[in-house]
């Protein structure tokens, strides 16, 4: 554990970081809300514009999703040790998920009426993997893996691509192993809005990303309150 003391030269800076606002600045909030409304209004066109503006990549309807060829290429590029580590991580997630899952039950109450509960997975959920300095393979496993273990039929992943239109091979491999059925090459607030609201190309998901408290920018953290997205409707 790293310990900081008042006598340390970096103490004031660390104190400033620890005391930062839990909520985003108004300017960030306004920017995110504007992006959400824009995606709602313009759909795919807004996604392509933001990809060009923020990620410096030209996308269109033919390059918006990761293809099977790209997945196959990524699998060939990933080292065996990385594949093994991903498999072990997924096995651990499935082990935990299987034992923590709520179980169906039924019974007869005092009036002789049969009562029961069934717990069914969503048909279609979205997961978001932020971009940044390093590919967040762990995030794809810890979100997609749980949805996969729950039996979700359609797992839609969104993650930003690079200026060349490519996504990190290890991340792609992990997403496929975690059950992703679609991978959208879009990041940021526009990706979350597309998953929640839908566009011409992106079918909306049922579960609006409850696993949002992952690494990400201040704009991304603002999206933890998804009532703003549903309000766009």
Task: Show the residue positions of the predicted features.
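N-terminal Rossmann-like NAD(P)+-binding subdomain of aldehyde/semialdehyde dehydrogenases
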Residues: 1-123
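Short acidic/polar active-site loop segments enriched in Thr and Asp
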Residues: 43, 153, 181
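Buried hydrophobic positions in well-ordered alpha/beta secondary-structure cores of metabolic enzymes
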Residues: 43, 125, 147, 209-212
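Positions that flank functional sites
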Residues: 54, 162-163, 190
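General beta-strand structural signal in soluble alpha/beta enzymes
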Residues: 105-108, 127, 138, 157-159, ...
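Conserved small-residue-rich beta-alpha loop and adjacent elements
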Residues: 107-173, 233
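Conserved NAD(P)+-binding/catalytic subdomain of aldehyde/semialdehyde dehydrogenases
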Residues: 177-233
């Amino acid at each position: 554990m790293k310990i900081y003391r008042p006598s340390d030269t970096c103490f004031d800076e660390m104190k400033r970081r620890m005391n930062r606002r839990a909520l985003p600045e108004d300017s960030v909030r306004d920017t995110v809300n504007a992006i959400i409304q824009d995606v709602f209004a313009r759909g795919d066109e807004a996604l392509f514009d933001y990809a060009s503006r923020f990620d410096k990549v030209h996308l269109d309807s033919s390059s918006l999703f990761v293809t099977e060829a790209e997945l196959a290429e990524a699998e060939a590029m990933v080292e065996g040790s990385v594949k093994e580590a991903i498999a072990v991580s997924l096995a651990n997630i499935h082990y935990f998920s299987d034992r923590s899952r709520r179980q169906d039950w039924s019974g007869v109450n005092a009036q002789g009426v049969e009562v029961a509960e069934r717990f069914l997975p969503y048909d279609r959920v979205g997961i978001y993997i932020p971009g940044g300095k390093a590919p967040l393979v762990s995030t794809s496993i810890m979100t997609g893996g749980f949805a996969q273990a729950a039996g979700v039929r359609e797992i839609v992943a969104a993650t930003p691509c690079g200026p060349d239109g490519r996504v990190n091979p290890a991340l792609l491999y992990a997403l496929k192993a975690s059950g992703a059925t679609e991978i959208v090459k879009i990041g940021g607030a526009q990706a979350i809005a597309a998953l929640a609201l839908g566009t011409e190309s992106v079918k909306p998901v049922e579960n609006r990303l409850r696993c949002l408290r992952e690494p990400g920018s201040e704009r991304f953290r603002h999206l933890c309150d998804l009532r703003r997205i549903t309000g766009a409707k």
